[in-house]
């Protein structure tokens, strides 16, 4: 009895054997689109086997840990060391510059230069110094002259008095007016006397003054105008302390006259 035939009622194609599949794949490779120049054939690539070896590095892909851990060549290491040395040297230079700036800021400033005289033809140094000194003296004299034109206040002190007073010599015309004013200022400090004039008569207190030169002299030994211009300070001192002032005052007034 013959075996029954299988009829394809659904329209299925008969199964193709494996050899036929391989031939079909070869035919498809011939018509496959590939990148390359005309007439060139790229080699066939076989799929990699399933092994534990590291995959070859693809072009443009990230590097793996093994590639990163590779040691640098000697030239690259030398270049890196040179770069670090330059950075360290630059840092040291910056620190040195900062220290120099601090030293310059902490250094004391130079004193102001003295007044110098400039001229042509060139002036010698000793003449410059002489002319500068003369200018300073003239400026001081002008200041003193201006002071003499206005008010002339001088300090007045008395031995035993706890305070000082100031008087304007320009407001008095003679020694008598000045003595009367001082008597009113220091009344009460002359023990056992009616006033300063009585004490002066007895020699207990003497009116003295300090002149421009810093010398102490008795009041009344020179003309009033000369006294008013040269007086810098008044002092009512005890007669025992004024011993020796009168001769000096007389000699000085004679030299001025």
Swiss-Prot record:
<feature type="region of interest" description="Disordered">
    <location>
        <begin position="85"/>
        <end position="119"/>
    </location>
</feature>
<dbReference type="GO" id="GO:0009734">
    <property type="term" value="P:auxin-activated signaling pathway"/>
</dbReference>
<dbReference type="InterPro" id="IPR053793">
    <property type="entry name" value="PB1-like"/>
</dbReference>
<dbReference type="GO" id="GO:0009733">
    <property type="term" value="P:response to auxin"/>
</dbReference>
<feature type="compositionally biased region" description="Low complexity">
    <location>
        <begin position="105"/>
        <end position="118"/>
    </location>
</feature>
<comment type="function">
    <text>Aux/IAA proteins are short-lived transcriptional factors that function as repressors of early auxin response genes at low auxin concentrations.</text>
</comment>
<keyword id="KW-0678">Repressor</keyword>
<keyword id="KW-0927">Auxin signaling pathway</keyword>
<comment type="subunit">
    <text>Homodimers and heterodimers.</text>
</comment>
<feature type="domain" description="PB1">
    <location>
        <begin position="151"/>
        <end position="239"/>
    </location>
</feature>
<feature type="region of interest" description="Disordered">
    <location>
        <begin position="1"/>
        <end position="51"/>
    </location>
</feature>
<comment type="similarity">
    <text>Belongs to the Aux/IAA family.</text>
</comment>
<keyword id="KW-0539">Nucleus</keyword>
<feature type="short sequence motif" description="EAR-like (transcriptional repression)">
    <location>
        <begin position="33"/>
        <end position="37"/>
    </location>
</feature>
<protein>
    <recommendedName>
        <fullName>Auxin-responsive protein IAA17</fullName>
    </recommendedName>
</protein>
<keyword id="KW-0804">Transcription</keyword>
<dbReference type="GO" id="GO:0005634">
    <property type="term" value="C:nucleus"/>
</dbReference>
<dbReference type="InterPro" id="IPR003311">
    <property type="entry name" value="AUX_IAA"/>
</dbReference>
<dbReference type="GO" id="GO:0006355">
    <property type="term" value="P:regulation of DNA-templated transcription"/>
</dbReference>
<dbReference type="InterPro" id="IPR033389">
    <property type="entry name" value="AUX/IAA_dom"/>
</dbReference>
<dbReference type="Pfam" id="PF02309">
    <property type="entry name" value="AUX_IAA"/>
</dbReference>
<keyword id="KW-0805">Transcription regulation</keyword>
């Amino acid at each position: 009895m013959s075996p029954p035939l299988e009829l394809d009622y659904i329209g299925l194609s008969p199964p193709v054997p494996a050899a036929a599949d391989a031939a079909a794949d070869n035919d498809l490779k011939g018509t496959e689109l590939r990148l390359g120049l005309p007439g060139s054939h790229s080699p066939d690539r076989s799929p990699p086997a399933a092994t534990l070896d590291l995959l070859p590095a693809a072009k443009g892909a990230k590097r793996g840990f093994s590639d990163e851990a590779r040691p640098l060549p000697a030239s690259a290491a030398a270049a890196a060391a040179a770069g670090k040395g330059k950075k360290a040297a630059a840092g040291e230079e910056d620190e040195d510059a900062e220290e120099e700036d601090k030293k310059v800021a902490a250094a004391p400033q130079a004193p102001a230069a003295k007044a110098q005289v400039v001229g042509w033809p060139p002036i010698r140094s000793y003449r410059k110094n002489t002319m500068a000194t003369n200018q300073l003296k003239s400026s001081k004299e002008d200041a003193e002259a201006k002071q003499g034109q206005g008010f002339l206040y001088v300090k007045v002190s008395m031995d035993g008095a706890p305070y000082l007073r100031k008087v304007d010599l320009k407001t008095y015309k003679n020694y008598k007016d000045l003595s009367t004013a001082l008597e009113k200022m220091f009344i009460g400090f002359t023990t056992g006397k009616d006033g300063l004039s009585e004490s002066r008569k007895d020699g207990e207190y003497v009116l003295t003054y300090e002149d421009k030169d810093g010398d102490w002299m008795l009041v009344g030994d020179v003309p009033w105008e000369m006294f008013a211009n040269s007086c810098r300070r008044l002092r009512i001192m005890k007669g025992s302390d004024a011993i020796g002032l009168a001769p000096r005052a007389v000699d000085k007034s004679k030299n001025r006259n």
